């Protein structure tokens, strides 16, 4: 996103700003839709499974996601937002479409499994918090893209993006270790 918004802001601040506002609107709209689905499904699961079982399942899922990150196998599909729209859609609509696509969570690549961990915890432990968590994640994502886009001029992204930076594998390992520890603690405390 910053690889598009940064140069767009450099060429035309109004166009770049429209892209970022569209990105915000799309992310929040899709996060709201996802949170509704998580809430309904999570409340249904709560009717079937007791709290200790839901906590245990959450913990096991967090451990699995953490191990996947540690093994550099974060679960996601190999797809990014549709690149062909860069030259055909106006900036605001492009941001809206891409933001909506990103906030659906299942449709694009992921850097770490933290997204899946939050989604699992919201679904199984506290479905009523799903709107706060998912919209909050969307706002943080847009804020991150905005800050990275504004700092584009100081530190341009390489042609391969930030993923080739030396800190990236460490970030994924730290996320994986955190998920494993949190998952193990969740399972350990589930039946206390």
Please tell me what each predicted stretch does:
Residues 181-192:
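Juxtamembrane boundary at the C-terminal end of a transmembrane helix
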Residues 48-109, 153-170:
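Alpha-helical multi-pass membrane helix bundles of inner-membrane/thylakoid proteins
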Residues 1-33:
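Juxtamembrane transmembrane-helix termini in multi-pass membrane transport proteins
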Residues 50-66, 125-142:
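Alpha-helical transmembrane segments
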Residues 141-159:
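Transmembrane alpha-helical segments of integral membrane proteins
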Residues 41-50, 115-121, 191:
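Membrane-interface helix termini and inter-helical loops of multi-pass transporters
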Residues 1-4, 106-118:
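Transmembrane helix boundary and interhelical junction motifs in multipass membrane proteins
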């Amino acid at each position: 996103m910053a690889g598009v918004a940064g140069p767009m802001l450099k060429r035309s601040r109004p166009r770049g700003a429209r892209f970022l506002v569209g990105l915000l609107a799309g992310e929040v709209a899709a996060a709201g839709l996802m949170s509704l689905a998580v809430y309904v499904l999570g409340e249904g699961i709560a009717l079937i499974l007791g709290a200790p079982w839901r906590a245990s399942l959450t913990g096991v899922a967090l451990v699995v996601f953490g191990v996947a990150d540690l093994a550099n196998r974060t679960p996601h599909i190999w797809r990014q937002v549709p690149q062909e729209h860069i030259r055909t859609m106006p900036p605001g609509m492009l941001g809206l479409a891409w933001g909506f696509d990103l906030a659906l969570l299942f449709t694009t690549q992921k850097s770490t499994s933290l997204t899946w961990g939050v989604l699992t915890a919201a679904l199984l432990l506290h479905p009523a918090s799903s709107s706060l968590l998912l919209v909050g994640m969307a706002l943080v994502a847009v804020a991150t893209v905005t800050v990275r886009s504004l700092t584009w001029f100081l530190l341009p992204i390489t042609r391969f993006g930030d993923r080739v930076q030396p800190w990236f594998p460490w970030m994924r390992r730290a996320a994986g270790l955190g998920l494993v520890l949190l998952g193990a603690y969740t399972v350990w405390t589930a039946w206390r």
